[in-house]
């Protein structure tokens, strides 16, 4: 049934200097020898968002691995919001990739998947043979018209006594979620004490000049100017031509030139909810062509 995320959730431990080993939940589906696609979640969600896409990709002949970030989904939660930083998320995700022996995968980088994954791809390109970018950027702390909107959204979200998860996703889709789907997004967070990870994400995003992640992200952006591996952007059509669109990525990254980029109609920010079939088709075609 569509509501079932997966029959085979798995956990590995990533090291942390302060808290010791932390359990990181992930899904691993498809034949072990099949071409690998790494699927990354975003703000407000966990790997449940891939419940429709994973079966389509595995049916098309791919292996899919989808991790929950520390603080999200079925992964361990830290006690305080301040326990998370952008760099720690980078380190945890790199540890996951190393332990899973990820090499030459297709990075399917959605929202925070791109914020973290583009940095990692620039620093250690051996993880990825190609990239699919969805409603994402590499934030470097430089001014952008979209940042003011984000700051206002962040202030509004953090002021809420109950930090929304399922409802956050529901406001970012064109096809409304069912009550059961909203409840599934909320399920890993029995009360507000479990939401330190989601609450911290908007605060640590490197959109300000004084963010400690800015120097490393700027260096990564410079490295991406030399990235020749194939890069495909699949964004919500409403983002095309705006500060949240893919144009800067396409212009900056050599591997993005000449690819079949698309703006998907009738999709919201949580594009994976709205367009799983089209995303599976376009991703399959991209892998076949590259």
What are these regions (language model features)?
Residues 52-56:
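Typically the conserved alpha-helix immediately C-terminal to a functionally engaged Cys/Sec
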Residues 1-16, 24, 29, 43, ...:
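Flexible "cap/lid" subdomain of the alpha/beta-hydrolase fold that forms the substrate-access gate
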Residues 34-41:
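Short beta-strand element of the alpha/beta-hydrolase
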Residues 57-78:
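Conserved alpha/beta-hydrolase
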Residues 39, 66-67, 109, 133, ...:
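Conserved SAM-binding loop
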């Amino acid at each position: 049934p569509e509501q079932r995320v997966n029959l085979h959730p798995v956990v590995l431990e990533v090291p942390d200097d302060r808290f010791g080993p932390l359990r990181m939940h992930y899904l691993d589906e498809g034949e072990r020898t099949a071409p690998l696609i790494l699927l990354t979640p975003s703000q407000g969600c966990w790997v449940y968002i891939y419940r429709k896409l994973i079966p389509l990709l595995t049916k098309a002949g791919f292996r899919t691995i989808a991790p929950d970030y520390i603080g999200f989904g079925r992964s361990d939660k830290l006690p305080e919001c301040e326990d998370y930083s952008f760099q720690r998320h980078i380190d945890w995700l790199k540890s996951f990739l190393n332990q899973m022996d990820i090499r030459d995968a297709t990075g399917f980088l959605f929202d925070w998947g791109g914020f973290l994954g583009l940095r990692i791809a620039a620093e250690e390109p051996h993880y990825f043979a190609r990239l699919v970018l969805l409603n994402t950027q590499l934030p470097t702390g430089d001014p952008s018209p979209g940042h003011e909107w984000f700051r206002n959204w962040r202030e509004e979200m953090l002021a809420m006594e109950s930090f929304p998860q399922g409802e956050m996703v529901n406001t970012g889709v064109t096809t409304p979620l069912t009550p059961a789907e909203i409840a599934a997004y909320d399920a890993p967070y029995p009360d507000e004490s479990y939401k330190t990870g989601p609450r911290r994400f908007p605060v640590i995003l490197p959109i300000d000049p004084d963010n400690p992640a800015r120097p490393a992200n700027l260096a990564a952006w410079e490295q991406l100017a030399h990235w020749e591996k194939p890069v495909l952007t699949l964004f919500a059509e409403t983002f095309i031509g705006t500060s949240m669109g893919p144009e800067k990525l396409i212009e900056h990254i050599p591997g993005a030139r000449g690819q079949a980029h698309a703006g998907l109609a009738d999709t919201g920010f949580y594009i994976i909810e709205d367009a799983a079939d089209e995303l599976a088709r376009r991703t399959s075609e991209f892998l076949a062509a590259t």
